[in-house]
Amino acid sequence: KLLRTEALAGTVASHTDDSQAQRLGEWLLNDDKNQRENMLVVEDICQRLQHSTQTLEVLPPQVVRLRKVQHLRRCIWTELKQANDEQCLLMLQPTAAVAGLPRQPAREFIQKVEPFNREWYAGSAGYLSPEQSEFCVALRSARVQEDSLRLYAGAGIVSGSDPEQEWQ
């Protein structure tokens, strides 16, 4: 019945030098645009879970340092009224990071404005088992078809975003 999820939104470059990486991480923790982006995802997750949970706790923001980038993360812990992993997954997908907010207008905008079909752009990767389940949002993928390779990637755009910077 316990659900542990996270809002992983808001990104800055990482660095091989620990002190440089730490400075960038501190900037990320204090940047209004990235905090807003992360909170949009937090609020969306909480709203989707509100009718299915007994308790809901959002932990303070942290920086997750990876090799090339650092992300802003807020863990969300909850106790579900009923344990149903498949329903939980369906309730949370597609995430705000994939579909945008408000969800339906964002999806309609994407279909109208983007000059291509997203096809395999994003989805869920993970496993279901009787004891526990674990899933993550897969935001990068590749499709090999005969002699061609198509790569899929994207960036989160919110008010205040610099689209060129998002691709860095």
Regions found by a protein language model. Give the residues of each.
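Contiguous alpha-helical scaffold segments within structured protein domains
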Residues: 4-111
